């Protein structure tokens, strides 16, 4: 009997090893393979200038840039337009060597900015400067602000995102800032950072960018690590990290805005949850907005992203988060929480992307609306008691329109998109049985919507 038990035990171990080996072989590239970086040489001129938020409240701004491996002294020069006074501030530099090359990451902080004022600035490395850029600070008001939200960008080299983003910029010149839900670059490589910057260069120097880490910004391995360039580009992370988690929050106008890092291995999410609860509990703002890369409720499979859901979703509901902005799954989807009467309430969960790649979609009954095979952008306007989220296709057609109204009588969600047809086109990447399955499920969803 003892021999039999041992054989059974060894058989189970062998089976686990075989199954594990098969899974590792199938998923090897996804989990462990990092594409070699193309060789590059950075010039000594300051380049890839990004304006971001800082770490000292809504009036704080940082600027980051890169240059070659010879320059050392980083400085920020700026002036309040019309004042005639120019300030020169010492910046910080970090020499970074990657598999493709090397150079300096630089960053600096603006000081004593004022509500409503406009500033011109340029950055220096030794005796080389960038062009002059300018930006305007928000007015001293808690009644109104707006921003643009973009899901994954993740474009190829010489891609189409630049035209897409230029169009968004011209449509919403008064947007206070831009939020990106990760996968800002296709890969953590210099050539893709160049591509990402060129896609947003006219925005990046004039509006604060607020970016969550995505899985494409990570280096794969047994323990995934955020590629070191990311935190020096979005330098607010250098001071906001919590127990090695790349998290950040800012109180802006009458909102607390939070970004999480959903790419971390599950054991890191415990400390993120701890930080998130402290941040939400401390917030006295009317609106609470959270951004993370992976959808809390996946639209690729009901069991996807379970650790993210278990760690964060209960806190979103307990502390009254209004809007959850997500990416990763390369389709459009909008979900609202439901109260005991089945009425829509917060949080409002939004999944979106602006990448040329569209993935398969698993229709989840928890969601209210889907969209496939298009690129999307969202404009969020907060005025008084109302937060309005409008989603658009790449051709500027209105695709979704939802209002969250918060007043003394409670929170109400108004769906203004009921008469806008859903677009459930076949993603170009699907074929064969997967394509047939998509069509069947899409038809079921359409019929479900008709019944509702």
Q: How should these model regions be labeled?
A:
Residues 2-149, 373, 382-385, 390-452:
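Acidic, histidine-bearing metal-coordination/catalytic regions of metal-dependent phosphoesterases
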Residues 100-101, 282-284, 288-298, 351-357, ...:
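Active-site-proximal loop/helix segment associated with metal-binding centers of metalloenzymes
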Residues 109, 118-136, 190-284, 311-312, ...:
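Extended active-site neighborhood of metal-dependent phosphoesterases/phosphodiesterases
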Residues 128-181, 186:
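An acidic-aromatic substrate-binding cleft motif
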Residues 144-145, 176, 247, 254-255, ...:
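Alpha/beta-hydrolase fold active-site loops
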Residues 149-151, 177-183, 208-215, 260-261, ...:
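Active-site neighborhood of phospho(di)ester-bond hydrolases with catalytic His/Asp-centered motifs
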Residues 159-160, 189-192, 270, 300-304:
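Short, solvent-exposed loop/turn segments at secondary-structure boundaries
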Residues 283-324, 344-345, 360:
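Active-site-proximal segments of metal-dependent phosphoesterases and phosphodiesterases across multiple
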């Amino acid at each position: 009997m003892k021999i039999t038990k041992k054989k059974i035990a060894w058989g189970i171990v062998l089976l686990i090893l075989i199954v594990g080996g098969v899974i590792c072989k199938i998923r090897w590239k996804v989990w462990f393979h990092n594409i070699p970086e193309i060789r590059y040489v950075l010039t000594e001129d300051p380049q890839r200038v990004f304006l971001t938020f800082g770490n000292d409240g809504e009036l704080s701004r940082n600027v980051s840039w890169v240059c070659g491996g010879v320059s050392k002294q980083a400085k920020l020069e700026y002036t309040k337009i019309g004042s005639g006074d120019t300030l020169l501030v010492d910046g910080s530099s970090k020499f970074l060597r990657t598999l493709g090359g090397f150079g300096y990451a630089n960053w600096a902080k603006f000081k004593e900015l004022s509500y409503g004022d406009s500033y011109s600035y340029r950055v220096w490395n030794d005796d080389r400067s960038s062009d002059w850029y300018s930006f305007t600070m928000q007015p001293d008001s808690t009644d109104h602000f707006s921003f643009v939200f973009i899901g994954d960008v993740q474009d190829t080299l010489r891609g189409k995102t630049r035209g897409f983003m230029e169009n968004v910029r011209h449509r919403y010149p008064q947007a206070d800032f831009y939020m990106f839900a990760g996968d800002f670059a296709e890969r953590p490589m210099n050539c893709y950072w160049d591509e990402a910057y060129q896609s947003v260069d006219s925005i990046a120097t004039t509006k604060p960018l607020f970016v969550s880490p995505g899985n494409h910004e990570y280096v794969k391995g047994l323990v995934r690590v955020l590629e070191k360039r990311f935190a020096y580009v979005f330098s607010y992370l250098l001071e906001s990290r919590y127990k090695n988690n790349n998290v950040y929050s800012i109180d802006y106008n009458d909102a607390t805005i939070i970004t999480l890092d959903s790419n971390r291995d599950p054991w890191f999410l415990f400390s993120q949850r701890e930080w998130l609860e402290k941040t939400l509990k401390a917030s006295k703002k009317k609106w609470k907005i959270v951004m993370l890369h992976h959808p809390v409720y996946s639209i690729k499979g009901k069991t996807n992203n379970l650790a993210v859901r278990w760690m964060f979703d209960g806190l979103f509901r307990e502390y009254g988060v209004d809007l959850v902005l997500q990416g990763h799954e390369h389709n459009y989807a909008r979900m609202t929480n439901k109260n005991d009467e089945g009425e829509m309430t917060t949080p409002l969960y939004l999944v979106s992307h602006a990448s040329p790649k569209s993935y398969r979609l698993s229709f989840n009954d928890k969601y209210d609306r889907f969209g496939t095979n298009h690129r999307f952008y969202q404009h969020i306007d907060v005025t008084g008691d109302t937060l309005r989220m409008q989603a658009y296709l790449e051709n500027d057609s209105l695709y979704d329109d939802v209002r969250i109204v918060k007043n003394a009588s409670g929170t109400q969600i108004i769906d203004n998109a009921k008469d806008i047809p859903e677009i459930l086109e076949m993603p170009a990447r699907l074929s064969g049985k997967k394509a047939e399955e998509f069509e069947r499920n899409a038809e079921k969803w359409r019929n479900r919507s008709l019944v509702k």
